């Protein structure tokens, strides 16, 4: 998907559209603003895409139910982000890309692959 013009968040989130019954076009639009570390090279877009899918899967609420699953969702996302950081040395886009140091820690395609793998790991842990 990244080679087709998707940003990192879109490439991860759109990978799981069929599992959740969401059209790729809708997910593409939802995830668009999360690329390039939300446009300022902060939190890796691939991890933002992963967080979207974990939230989509784990949330049991709606606007009427409030926040009954938020804490659990945050915990699950935090666990996967920590695993990503352990492997790649950061979760910050500009650090991963070596913008200030000249040393690339992880390429965009590898960040996407790692985030997809962590999302698949999460889904397997949930029995999916």
What residues fall within each predicted segment?
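A short glycine/serine-rich beta->alpha loop
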Residues: 1-3, 33-42, 99-105
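C-terminal binding/interaction regions
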Residues: 68-128
């Amino acid at each position: 998907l990244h080679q087709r013009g998707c940003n990192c968040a879109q490439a991860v989130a759109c990978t799981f559209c069929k599992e959740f019954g969401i059209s790729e076009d809708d997910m593409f639009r939802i995830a668009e603003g999360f690329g390039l570390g939300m446009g300022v090279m902060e939190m890796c877009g691939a991890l933002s895409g992963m967080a979207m899918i974990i939230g989509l899967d784990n949330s049991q609420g709606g606007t009427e139910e409030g926040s009954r699953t938020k804490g659990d969702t945050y915990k699950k996302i935090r666990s996967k982000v920590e695993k990503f950081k352990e492997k790649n040395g950061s979760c910050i886009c500009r650090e991963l890309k070596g913008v200030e140091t000249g040393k690339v820690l992880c390429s965009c395609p590898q960040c996407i692959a790692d985030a997809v793998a962590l999302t698949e790991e999460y889904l397997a842990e949930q029995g999916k």
